Amino acid sequence: MATPQLSPGVLTREVDLTVGRAENVLDNIGAIAGPFEIGPIDEPTDITTETQLINTFGKPISTDAQYQYWMTAASFLTYGGVLKVVRTDDDDLVNANGNRSHETVVTDLKIKSYDDYVANYAGVGQTFGYAAKTPGTWANNLKVCVIDNAADQVLGIGTTSGVSVGMGVSVSLTNQVIAGSGDTSSFTGHLKGIITGLGATTIDVKITQRVTTAGVSTDITYAQGDQARSILAGNNVSVINSSEVGVATAKIEGGNYAKDWYDEQTMGLTNSTVYWKSISPRPDTSNWAADRSSKNDGIHVVVVDDLGDVTGIQGNILEKNLNLSKAKDAVSSENAPQKIFYKDYLSIYSEYVYAGDDPSDGSDGFKAASDFSSGYTAITAASGGWNRNAQGITFNVIGNDTYTLTAGADYSATGGYTATLGNLITSYNLFKNKDEIAVDYLLMGPGLGDKAASQSKAGRLISIAGERKDCMATISPHRADVVDLSLIHI
């Protein structure tokens, strides 16, 4: 019988040393700070590839030799490992942002990071509509296209003299067949709606109720082409004010018309015509809101590179954020427990923008359209405002709107990329506590404009390495001392 013993008392055994070994032990951890094109401010971010470096912090730029910082980072990554990158702050850095109807933008808005947004900009009362995710000129001229379910139909009525947003519309129905669940019924009374938008010869209408001759109201939702739920050709339309007095009438015939509102909506782009219906069906009341006796919370937010300044492709649709909600507590019915409140969703999932002010409250000077309440009285901005939990709320509507982001600025008013010594030191100080952040190599990158500043930068990195006692500082000489020197013959 075979035996593993080669000699008395000596036992040989094969051991797989891969079992129980330490996995994913990180080494070769670098750290660098610099004036990068994009990215969060003063927040260390782990980067492992050059592609990730470009996607997170932008490409190398020749202005002010910014590429020297980028090349230092990229060179380190070629050896593997992890590079912790910090984008340095500057007084001139500003996030591109936009308000409704191209009103004055905020020229000093600086949202440094997601944490900064949550702490200081996610609440009510903001002065910007939408803002770029990070500071810089990179987002200038991006467009944020927004649409909700502001109207069901657009009616061409010839003239809108004496008509205003918030008034009601009424269409008489006689012996109208109503489809039910397995049966039909006959209805006599009138179809009722509210005016949510106004043109020179057109009104935008949202269908809200059917009212019997006895005054019994039933809430309904619009259905295109259904006489029991929409206004059709041949109907006589009456416009009613809040005192329930008729102020105008029109028959949908001849030059007058009734069209589906959403089918007519296009994005506010300069270089292309894109219909919203080609992007997604109309945003509707979410299941979350409907289950809580609320409505009109649905909203789409789409980011477009209209001029091609960001991607080089005019009209490039960068991202579609669809079927979001105006309700602060809204949760997706398809991906629970994912939050779909538009501010929360964009802050987490959008690569390009944050949302700021509630655009339905009229605080930006743009007329706030309202939805239907009772009788022919429009809901006030206060009672239908966004940013509240969905419980018995008929959310205000804004319709189809476009925000153009402008006023973004880099490290100088003229688009420079020079970081100051003080701001660089602030960024490198984020690496000084070895108990909070692991670092093996502190990368200085290039020196600064004068020799004393270059020496000060190097000195601080050496000091941090000395305080930590677990890493090395890699130092660069002052550029003027080693580059373009004339030969000296002795």
Language model: regions and residue ranges:
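Surface-exposed assembly/interface segments
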Residues: 1-488
